[in-house]
Amino acid sequence: MAKYAAAIDQGTTSTRCMIFDHSGNVICYDQKEHEQIYPRPGWVEHSPDEIWERTQSVIRGALSKGGLSASDIVAVGITNQRETTVVWNRKTGRPVYNAIVWQDTRTDQICNELAADGGQDRFRAKVGLPLATYFSGPKIRWILDNVPDAREAAEAGDVVFGNIDTFLTWWLTGGPNGGVHVTDVTNASRTMLMNLETLDWDDEILSVMGIPRQMLPKIVPSSMVYGTAVGELAGVPVAGILGDQQAAMVGQTCFDVGEAKNTYGTGSFMLLNTGTKIVPSKSGLLTTVCYKFGDQPAVYALEGSIAITGALVQWLRDNLGLITTSAEVEALANLVEDNGGIYFVPAFSGLFAPYWRSDARGVIVGLTRYVNKGHLARAVLEATAYQTREVLDAMEQDSGVKLTALKVDGGMVYNNTLMQFQADILGVPVIRPKVAETTSLGAAYAAGLAVGFWSNTDEMRANWGVDHTWTPQMDEATRERLYRGWKKAVTRTFDWVE
């Protein structure tokens, strides 16, 4: 009898397939990186074909490592880098252009034109999002405007849009031969095209953005059987879809109003469960769908999205060559006692929450001859913690709820220096769970829930346990002095791009 749930976790830098048992433990997994394509400054692309090839490869690899076959898997869920935009031919499966990645800033002109009538918050009341290069709608518009024949093909229904979840679900369920063209509410809520109240595409916004409705996928719940897989997972129900940050909320079992988590990946993303209530933000956060299980009402969240955190460590490694592996940043940072008076604001693709400034670019401030590479490494880690503090402050303002602890996950949570500094600068305990692969786990939970492998959220919550807690050890005066320095540094990034 099938006794495991599988997740495909398609992230910004790599794709994983993870297989979990009923207790939420990882049984086996496989992972492969894919190429980051930078055609021009501010442009970031992926090859959709390479991503699909990597996906098939990691499914094979995970099954093989676990000595398993498709018959051992009850269901498969998909979680994905959100906003990243693919437009492809529904007859051949061929993309008309590379995937335009969430960090890509090429749509700034489109966003400015749209904001000329009604400002950056023109659509916020309906979609919960500001006009920003981050979201999919303007990326679709760019492809339709710039790829020859794309608009005509879209209007004729020959080419279709999807975020990565949609593209993978379509291929997993047969591609050109009957592939299912769907997206879940969490991914749809990141396009700028879905109305948060109706959970359907908004015709007025589609018309303003110039996007034909017929190219869009059907919006479905995050947990239900969408179709059956072909290929390596032949016969397995494809039954869960969640954007990566929403998947981490489910994996962290943040099912109650007021529960929050922060995921440290390429960027960092803090979400706060607001229940079935849509809470508009006055502090630069996003209002987003957290999850929708079957025919139960949708649950919403406030989100603070930070563009660059883990990516800054990669930059230190790949662009400066100061370290050879990302893990070495901790040892380098520990060569010094503090940041030597420097702050590093990584506005490589503008600033996301709570500023939403696409004109910002990265700065290192406070440099003196005293500063060495250890200070630089420490400033790199501290940047992640300071940006998280800004988001936490905004969340407390919007929700009126004071956070008592922060659940954390993602690759950087094994960096003790960073996690201790995070607790210090927030002034609240930081908690790492036993299973830190919460994004994949959330997708597996959504899929397993749809087929009855887990009968309810209480069963999932029972699986959650604490691995490590960091408590604040910094005095209030030091905390606020350091944070003031950060706020000052951030202002130096503004108005850089004309």
Swiss-Prot record:
Identification of the protein by name: Glycerol kinase
Keyword Endoplasmic reticulum: no
Chain's role: Key enzyme in the regulation of glycerol uptake and metabolism. Catalyzes the phosphorylation of glycerol to yield sn-glycerol 3-phosphate.
CDD domains tied to this protein: ASKHA_NBD_FGGY_GK
GO MF entry, a single one: ATP binding
EC nos: 2.7.1.30
Protein family per UniProt: Belongs to the FGGY kinase family.
Keywords, alphabetical: ATP-binding, Glycerol metabolism, Kinase, Nucleotide-binding, Transferase
Organism from which the protein derives: Chloroflexus aggregans (strain MD-66 / DSM 9485)
Activity regulation text: Inhibited by fructose 1,6-bisphosphate (FBP).
PROSITE patterns assigned to the protein according to its UniProt record, in alphabetical order: FGGY_KINASES_1 (PS00933), FGGY_KINASES_2 (PS00445)
Gene Ontology process terms (BP): glycerol catabolic process; glycerol metabolic process; glycerol-3-phosphate metabolic process
Residues annotated to bind ADP: 12, 16, 266, 310, 411, 415
Gene of this entry: glpK
Positions of glycerol binding: 82-83, 134, 244-245
Positions annotated to bind sn-glycerol 3-phosphate: 12, 82-83, 134, 244
Catalysed transformations (reactions): glycerol + ATP = sn-glycerol 3-phosphate + ADP + H(+)
